[in-house]
């Protein structure tokens, strides 16, 4: 069988970004009902220092056995003096001690919400080696970028793959057995988001892949 993972970044308790009643949530539910698709939802624990995770929000997602909640940093933001240069790549600017404090703060909030995430993806993909050393201590696996993170060593299980749900040509098979799609729940800075057009397009991708492969829809932790 050929595995298929769908990962979605940046979900947090803000309307339009992964809350009950959002149209994107309906899209995900429909894909699960129609095909059996499962999802890794990568969530910052305190998005932009404005939207902390809440137990109600976490519980909403945990009710679905086709969802895995994963860590996507804490603030998904950087200090003002660095923002122009590194965007929101939170773990590019932190040293070991700072990164450990940040991860502990993040996991503390997750714990208050009743969940311990197994996996991690860096906001904006960027991470330095000291931060990677910290991340490796606290998570069972990391989703990394095969090019951006090529010089970074993680002392934990790692997975690569970031094909967009809006792809039309370049869909890759990783490790000869896994399709790995990566997307964002919303945002106006790229086209790889859960719009109606991309939802419809992704259904065509799944239809095509199901005709070509015996698909096994999984979350990343099910691959560990």
Report each predicted region and the residues it spans.
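C-terminal domain-boundary segment and adjacent tail
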Residues: 33-36, 143-144, 185-224
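Non-transmembrane alpha-helical segments in soluble domains
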Residues: 29, 58, 107, 111, ...
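His/Asp/Glu-enriched short active-site or ligand-binding loop at hydrolase and phosphoryl-transfer sites
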Residues: 132-168
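Active-site beta->alpha N-cap acidic-glycine motif
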Residues: 1-66, 214
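Generic beta-sheet signal
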Residues: 3-4, 39, 174-183
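Metal-dependent polysaccharide deacetylase catalytic core of the NodB/CE4 family, i.e.
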Residues: 37-129, 183-189
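A conserved mid-domain beta-alpha-beta active-site/ligand-binding segment of alpha/beta enzyme cores
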Residues: 153-175, 182-192
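Well-ordered, non-membrane alpha-helical segments in soluble/globular domains
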Residues: 18-28, 52-56, 96-104, 167-168, ...
